[in-house]
Curated annotation (Swiss-Prot):
Location of the region described as Disordered in the Swiss-Prot/TrEMBL record: 149-211
Gene Ontology terms: cellular component: cytoplasm; cytoplasmic ribonucleoprotein granule; intracellular membraneless organelle
Localisation: Cytoplasm, Cytoplasmic ribonucleoprotein granule
Native source species: Bos taurus
Main localization (coarse): cytoplasm
Domains: entry comment: Disordered region at the N-terminus undergoes liquid-liquid phase separation (LLPS) for the formation of membraneless compartments that store maternal mRNAs in oocytes. The 3CxxC-type mediates binding to the 3'-UTR of mRNAs.
Subunit-structure text: Interacts with YBX2.
Protein name, entry field: ZAR1-like protein
Keywords in alphabetical order: Cytoplasm, Developmental protein, Differentiation, Metal-binding, Oogenesis, RNA-binding, Zinc, Zinc-finger
Taxonomy of the source species: Eukaryota, Metazoa, Chordata, Craniata, Vertebrata
A family per Pfam: Zn_ribbon_3CxxC
Membership in a protein family: Belongs to the ZAR1 family.
Length: 318
């Protein structure tokens, strides 16, 4: 009985075995070769742990994984199974039935940080003070996606300077030096309230405002004018960068396919009252605010069905 090595943990089906070690003349019990069987792998209690090639199939099952973690915790507390880093990217995709394009957003590649207990804590990026986080229930727990909206600091940027040391405490022998700042405070308090309002508030220029590193798009009313074939038509679905008249998706002329359009872009609103919904009796030109892409300029939109929802739909993954 002294030569029988007992495993300190409870035996699970398919895990562990009782072997006779150090006994001369006795052969080890024969077991089927693990390469020729499809059963779960058998881990033998030896000084060197044997890891079969089909161990990954057993780690997928949560129940068997818990058993395997119990085995490893008894053998070596520092030994644990680590999951691979998720390789994911955040992109913006333009879905269109008429124009087939895929545009990668300026967010660039991002990696999902896992909060599972088996994930390594060294690969996690520090969370920003101003970020967007969304929790998605996954197989191993909650996955949080964080985006740093502010620009990262430069690598060569020196650290902020330390504050100057405070002056030594003055003794009671210097009373006239203490009276001078008090007189200055009295003069500042005696100033009129108008002068106080006129003085601008101090602005800390050492902390620049954070700028987002991505751009949103919005549809604007566009004038398409071709200088080559003298064609002029209008369309409401011109995708511009939000807050500007800069066109994001450019396209060629529908007739000559030479010059880029649009020539000019403005918001979808009435030209008289500058409102999206108005009841002006006279308008500068015919604009149907409900369906602004149907215009009576060149006749290309007459008797044609256009679906506002299926032309463009832009998706942001944040």
């Amino acid at each position: 009985m002294e030569r029988i090595f007992c495993v300190p943990y409870s035996l699970y089906p398919g895990y562990g075995n009782m072997l006779r070690l150090g006994q001369s003349g006795l052969s080890e019990p024969r077991q089927p070769h693990w390469r020729q069987t499809n059963v779960p792998p058998t881990f033998l209690a030896r000084p060197r742990l044997l890891m079969p090639s089909n161990a990954s199939d057993c780690c997928v099952d949560p129940y068997k994984r818990a058993q395997l973690m119990a085995v490893f915790s008894h053998m070596n507390p520092g030994l644990s199974l680590r999951l691979r880093k998720a390789n994911t990217k955040d992109v913006g995709v333009q879905v269109s039935l008429r124009v087939g394009k895929s545009v990668q957003c300026s967010l660039g590649p991002r990696t999902l940080d896992s909060l599972s207990p088996w994930a390594s804590a060294g690969h996690r990026a520090p969370a920003s003070a101003w970020g967007v986080s969304s929790s998605v229930p996954g197989h191993w727990g909650e996955v949080r996606l964080r985006e740093e909206l502010s620009d990262p600091p430069e690598a060569g940027q020196p650290p902020p300077p330390l504050p100057p040391p405070s002056p030594p405490p003055r003794s009671e022998e210097d009373p006239p030096e203490e009276l001078q700042p008090r007189e200055e405070l009295v003069e500042e308090d005696s100033s009129s309230p108008r002068e106080r309002k006129s003085k601008p508030a101090p602005v800390d220029s050492s902390q620049p405002l954070g700028r987002p590193n991505f751009q949103f798009l919005e549809p604007k009313y566009g004038y398409f004018h071709c200088k080559d074939c003298k064609t002029r038509w209008e369309s409401a679905y011109v995708w511009c960068i939000s807050g500007t008249n800069k066109v994001y998706f450019k396209q060629l002329c529908c007739k000559c396919q030479k010059s880029f359009n649009p020539y000019r872009v403005e918001a979808i609103q009435c030209q008289t009252c500058s409102k999206s919904r108005c009841s002006c009796p006279q308008k500068k030109r015919h604009i149907n605010l409900r369906r602004p892409h149907r215009q009576e300029l060149c006749g290309r939109c007459k008797d044609k069905r256009f679906s506002c929802g299926s032309i463009y739909s832009f998706k942001y993954i944040m």
